Amino acid sequence: MCGILAVLGAADWSQAKRAHVLSCSRRLKHRGPDWSGLYQCEGNFLAQQRLAIVSPLSGDQPLYNADRTIVVVANGEIYNHKKIRKQFASKHTFSTGSDCEVIIPLYEEYGEDFVDMLDGVFAFVLYDTRTKTYMAARDAIGVNPLYIGRGSDGAVWISSEMKALNEDCVEFEIFPPGHLYSSAAGGLRRWYKPQWFAENVPATPYQPLLLREAFEKAVIKRLMTDVPFGVLLSGGLDSSLVAAVTKRHLIKTEAAEKFGAELHSFVVGLEGSPDLIAAREVADHLGTIHHEFHFTVQDGIDAIEEVIYHDETYDVTTIRASTPMFLMARKIKALGVKMVLSGEGSDELLGGYLYFHFAPNKEEFHKETCRKVKALHQYDCLRANKATSAWGLEVRVPFLDKEFINVAMSMDPEWKMYNADLGRIEKWVMRKAFDDEEHPYLPKHILYRQKEQFSDGVGYNWIDGLKAFTEQQVSDEMMKNAAKVYPHNTPVNKEAYYYRMIFERLFPQESARETVPWGPSIACSTPAAIEWVEQWKASHDPSGRLIASHNSASASANHTNHANANANGNSNGKANGNCAMAANGTNGVGLVVANGTANGKMEA
């Protein structure tokens, strides 16, 4: 991931202004430590901090067309860039090997109506010197972060992270996913318009082969890299499938020719935590060289302020899950790895969180998946991107591939729901799709096993330790006055209050606090899903452990799953509150590296 900053229409064109913009851009240097570039045309500035993944020797930014009348800065990976290059080979002279350079000929050919032709994740700004207009766009789901604001002189500021613009803007906000901003048209408009966005319940039958093929394609296209890469592996279903598919197809890729097909697996957790044990088992099956990173509760507590600074949030669940990932990312980068694949998005698309078990019907189930996918940019996408970008590590998420999303979200939700009578547990559609008797991807007991929420999976003592620590940092008197001190999104417990104090010190602007989502949550639910169960309304802890069936789920899941692994038929769409459920909150903090840079067991 790179970092971009654009200041457009500034009243001040001076060298001092240029120096100030460059200084602001350097606040994003952690995202792109490999190179920096700055373009200026009168009061328009486009800056980029580059993390070189594709074409590291020739892809420095800003990017230009042949006569330098169009300039682009981008943070993105365009997986169909080779196809687009062939399309424009006779019309456009490419000057770099950067995948993002294809944005320029697309704009020259189609104007601003080309964004949906990009297959990948991105946040970019394009300036056209001929018309003195500009456009900016963000990918469909918001995998790559982006913010937009207005300076006191009326200039538009656009940045990968708000830390580069918050001190210069009188107001700013999240640049919405799936949108583009056009100075010519005078504002934002949505370019991503999938059918599922209307939240109408689909009726397409489950097609396991179609689902499997869409996911395999999503993984394979993300193996596009010119640097050492890996796959996060926590031992849960989603990260294990990402690792298994990578293992199966890596040998056929250009990446294998460059870095070899040997896989190294990494996992982080407290000593004896569920993720360490589960990841070790998956790594043994896949034949990886396994590496374990251990951290202590104190290590995590010491990192909290840095995590909040980089994540730019005070959301409790995000901070809990980000901290181990943040610690691990530093170790991964130190081994020479610059890109990893991860399993974010599966639980939102397929209803894999613990609480989905209690959905009263398929209509509510589907609406909740829609709400969750739409909100990913404020939660798991934000966490995965920023916690790793803090150390110049890029995360790619195949579950959030546009084609895979279309397949998953067009399926009749009855197939996704738990049904004990038919042997269907959560994410059964994905498990069944990869249950290949002849050429198994994973053993059945792994394929059909419950997975913890990530912050629980790295070790239950992590959450308990956070609660105990913050209990000592925030007094009862402070909590009594919480609504007066923080009238917007008032903290409901001491852990939330502690995170909020740090956030407000780092980002004191009203606009900053309004970028953070709020509302009650249970096991990562949206506020709307709280209405499903009366007892949930009184909870102030988002942990999945508060779901009644969580404690018994692991014990019963394997027995149920093996007995029903091959079950077929139609779901009745009803949820049974006493049966096993699964969650895979952040899909792994672990890593499978496709090169030989790391060997043996290491401890953080």
Curated annotation (Swiss-Prot):
Its EC number is 6.3.5.4. ATP binds at residues 232, 268, 342-343. InterPro entries: Asn_synth_AEB, Asn_synthase, Asn_Synthetase, AsnB_N, GATase_2_dom, Ntn_hydrolases_N, Rossmann-like_a/b/a_fold. The active site is at 2 (nucleophile). Pfam families: Asn_synthase (PF00733), GATase_7 (PF13537). One of its GO terms (biological process) is L-asparagine biosynthetic process. L-glutamine binds at residues 50-54, 75-77, 99. Residues 211-451 form the Asparagine synthetase domain. SUPFAM superfamilies: Adenine nucleotide alpha hydrolases-like (SSF52402), N-terminal nucleophile aminohydrolases (Ntn hydrolases) (SSF56235). It is an enzyme of class 6 (ligase). The keyword Ribonucleoprotein does not apply. Transmembrane segments: none annotated. GO terms for cellular component: cytosol. Keywords: Amino-acid biosynthesis, Asparagine biosynthesis, ATP-binding, Glutamine amidotransferase, Ligase, Nucleotide-binding. This is Asparagine synthetase [glutamine-hydrolyzing] 1.
